[in-house]
């Protein structure tokens, strides 16, 4: 059974690097990853996730009005969801992620 994981730490504690390494590990096993961050995080560009150690990946920017269940339905098959800076999602979006875990048996890893 899938779970929703919340990994947190202080600034500079390698949360983004861990998220990107996790993405890589899933993709190495042939799994499809939906990588996202809040749209408000534009420090490295709207659709780029970059760690302080230089790891980078394209991601989806999620605005506060985005219905994550609807976006999930629009995606091709997804095996895991990874969210960076999840503390900036709305409470409703966190509930939507929980619903995806429960209904779709989809692991969700949140970093913040």
Language-model segments: what does each one mean?
Residues 86-97:
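Conserved ATPase-coupling elements of RecA-like P-loop NTPase cores
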Residues 106-112:
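Structural recognition of the conserved hydrophobic beta-strand(s) that form the central parallel beta-sheet
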Residues 84-86, 112:
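Walker B catalytic acidic pair
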Residues 29, 103-104:
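Helix C-cap/helix->beta junction micro-motif
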């Amino acid at each position: 059974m899938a779970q929703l994981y919340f990994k947190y730490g202080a600034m500079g504690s390698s949360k983004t690097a861990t998220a990107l390494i996790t993405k890589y590990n899933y993709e190495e096993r042939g799994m499809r990853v939906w990588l996202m961050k809040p749209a408000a995080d534009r420090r490295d560009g709207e659709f780029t996730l970059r760690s302080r150690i230089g790891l980078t990946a394209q991601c989806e920017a999620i605005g506060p009005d985005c219905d994550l269940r609807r976006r999930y339905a629009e995606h091709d098959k997804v095996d895991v969801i990874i969210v960076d800076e999840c503390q900036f999602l709305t409470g409703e979006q966190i509930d939507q992620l929980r619903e995806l875990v429960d209904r779709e048996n989809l692991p969700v890893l949140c970093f913040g």
